[in-house]
A protein has these predicted regions:
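Extracellular beta-strand-rich solenoid/capping regions of secreted or surface-exposed proteins
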Residues: 43, 47-52, 68-103, 112-131, ...
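Ser/Thr/Gly-rich low-complexity blocks that favor extended beta-strand/coil architectures
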Residues: 113, 162-208, 355-394
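Bacterial Sec-dependent signal peptides at the C-terminal "C-region" and cleavage site
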Residues: 14-22
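Small/polar beta-strand repeat architecture
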Residues: 198-242, 377-379, 387-429, 437
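Acidic Gly/Asp/Thr-rich repetitive segments characteristic of extracellular carbohydrate-active
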Residues: 25-60
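Short glycine/acidic-rich loop motifs that flank beta-strands on beta-rich extracellular proteins
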Residues: 113-119, 139-143, 243-246, 266-272, ...
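The right-handed parallel beta-helix/beta-solenoid scaffold, focusing on the short coil/turn
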Residues: 58, 92, 100-102, 109, ...
């Protein structure tokens, strides 16, 4: 009798957990708003569900509420994540792996993480959707303080530490700490207290974290000289580590992220690599609204796509308070380290935060770049075979032995500086109807040869350049050249209030070319900028380097006096090695003087 009762209860539990093609996670013991550790329960539930799902579409439902995730009992994974610190293992809150035709619906839930964790991973999936939830950390690794007094003569600042920040004064140093981590910050970003915009002309600042004294509860007196930090200014103390993004995608096909808000992550909001066809629909990296006491979101980019293909569609998002771009799209050059024979090279990932993940597959089309001039050398080729040269397989590898279908140009070897670019893993991009505001560094960055459309966005006080087209085989080794870019119907409001890398104008076309004078061809091409509105307090609107084919037409440039002009570039247009330029039918406050407003260099 007792056995029958147990079996009956088990059947009821299983029926409750999966009903009508839907898995209700409450059937796996998950309960909202308890403060209890959800990590082991969700890990077990997702593992069981992954083993059961077939080709039919299923939904995984998380009852609405707050769920807390701790490192204890979390899924442990060894992930090598592009543009992040390669420390392992990663402790994953929700690990979606090898799933097909799955919809995860958080139903408005808040996922709150503790310590140092990777909140969500989606790996090896096909036709999956994640939607309706937010990601945050109870104690972010960024420390926020508010300036109370600034003695500019004595070089002393008194500041108050935000109530959620955990810290101690150790040997007269401010040390931020949390569950399983601590750091002594040296750098920060200053925000206006009332607007949450970056303070004008401050950029990255040193912070008063050394030789300090706690003069009252959470009130610190520090030797710190910076006259721009008036009382009421909010400063975030940050580091430059980026162990994990908020959402990690790898080897996924046809993915949708819908109505998701990332309020904080220690790395990027989203990092997707080697994935195909990604839709972001109202995916945001944002504060919790106007009344959120925080001024920051992520430690790095809001969204980042490395070595992806198909279509990246990002629409309807809000990106604010992050420490870098709202979106960055690129591939990765391998540096040629050895020529084995006329068809075989050894290529290597060169940046310490970008290695360990798959680079290419047999059949992929590639081309070769001379790094100093960023010119294509020889003809396109195809990968015949590829294997890791320094690891048993590609997992964790830095070097790859690549055999090509056709002989490689004899000039390409370890003698010189050459890069290998994978043209197969390059996406089209549609970035539209987004708001990008009050962030550090830049608004957006695109480096793909496929069609890129940037339209109907608002770039509001992005602090540096609003849109950057790059390409770099010398530092980050991020590919590649743009050949079909349409920037239209966007509004740009007071970009360039600060100076950061590549911020030569509101729109900056800035490939890294160490030996520009020796370059014979052009890197970028096919760029059209039209029907946009620019509101600016300064002069530079468009900077371009090494471009063949650039159109700037039907744009409106309105001048204001919101800040003093200070940029070193005092030309509306500054061109270096740019040909086939068309500037016409634009409206400028105060008129346009071609001789004065255009600077062109060969």
């Amino acid at each position: 009798m007792k056995l029958n009762s147990v079996l009956t209860l088990l059947f009821i539990a299983l029926f409750t957990a999966c009903k009508g093609g839907a898995y209700d996670l409450s059937g796996y013991g998950l309960k909202p708003d308890t403060g209890e550790n959800a990590s082991p329960l969700i890990a077990k539930a997702l593992q069981e569900i992954a083993a059961e799902v077939n080709s039919d579409t299923v939904r995984i439902l998380l009852p609405k509420g707050r769920y807390d995730f701790y490192p204890e009992g979390a899924s442990k994974r060894e992930y090598f994540i592009s543009n992040h610190d390669q420390d392992n293992p990663k402790l994953v809150g929700l690990a979606f792996e090898n799933m097909k035709n799955v919809i995860f619906d958080g139903q408005g839930s808040e996922l709150v993480f503790h310590g140092r964790m990777l909140p969500v991973s989606l790996v090896g999936s096909e036709n999956c959707t994640l939607k309706n939830f937010s990601i945050d950390f109870a104690n972010p690794h960024i420390s926020q303080v508010k300036v109370l007094e600034n003695d500019t003569v004595g070089g002393l600042i008194t500041y108050e530490v935000a109530p959620w920040v955990e810290y101690e004064i150790r040997d007269s140093n401010f040390v931020a700490k949390g569950e399983g981590w601590e750091h002594a910050p040296a750098w920060g970003i200053a925000f206006e207290g009332d607007t949450k915009r970056l303070v004008y002309a401050t950029s990255d600042i040193s912070v008063g974290s050394k030789h300090v004294a706690e003069i009252a509860s959470r009130k610190i007196l520090a030797p710190w000289k910076n006259k721009k930090l008036i009382p009421g200014t909010v400063v975030v103390f940050r580091g430059y580590g980026r162990p994990t993004p908020g959402v990690f995608m790898y080897h996924d096909t046809n993915t949708t992220l819908e109505n998701i808000q990332v309020h904080y992550a220690e790395g990027m909001g989203l990092l997707a690599q080697m994935s195909e066809n990604i839709t972001l629909d109202k995916f945001s990296v944002c504060l919790r609204g106007k009344d959120d006491p925080r001024y920051f979101t992520t430690q790095a980019d809001a969204t980042h796509f490395s070595g992806c293909k198909g279509l990246i569609r990002s629409v309807g998002g809000l990106y604010e308070g992050m420490m870098d771009d709202a979106i960055n799209v690129h591939g990765t050059y391998l540096k040629v380290q050895k020529r084995i024979d006329n068809k075989t090279l050894v290529g290597e990932y060169m940046h310490g935060q970008s290695y360990g993940f798959e680079w290419g597959r047999p059949g992929d089309v590639v081309q070769f770049i001379e790094s100093k001039t960023m010119e294509v050398l020889g003809e396109q080729n195809k990968v015949a075979a590829i294997e890791a040269a320094d690891k048993p397989d590609g997992h964790g590898a830095k070097q790859f032995r690549i055999t090509f279908e056709k002989p490689v140009d004899p000039a390409i070897s370890e003698v010189g500086t050459y890069g290998i670019e994978n043209l197969e893993w390059t996406p089209e991009v549609y970035f539209a109807d987004n708001v990008i505001r009050n962030n550090r560094a830049r608004g957006s960055l695109f480096s793909t040869p496929k069609k890129t459309v940037v339209e109907k966005n608002v770039f509001d006080h992005t602090s540096g350049t609003a849109i950057l087209l790059c390409g770099d085989c010398n530092g980050w080794f991020e590919t590649g050249a743009c050949h079909d870019v349409h920037i239209r119907n966007n509004k740009f409001i007071n970009a360039l209030t600060n100076q950061f890398q590549f911020t030569n104008a509101v729109i900056s076309i800035y490939p890294e070319i160490p030996d520009l004078k020796s370059q014979k061809r052009y890197f970028h091409s096919g760029i059209v900028i039209e029907d946009n509105e620019f509101e600016t307090f300064d002069m530079p609107i468009l900077y371009a380097k090494s471009v063949d084919g650039l159109v700037f037409r039907n744009n409106v440039i309105r001048q204001n006096h919101d800040y003093p002009a200070f940029h070193w570039n005092n030309h509306r247009f500054f061109f270096q090695r740019v040909v086939n330029v068309e500037i016409k039918d634009n409206r400028f406050d105060g008129g346009f003087d071609e001789e004065k407003d255009i600077r062109s260099e060969e």
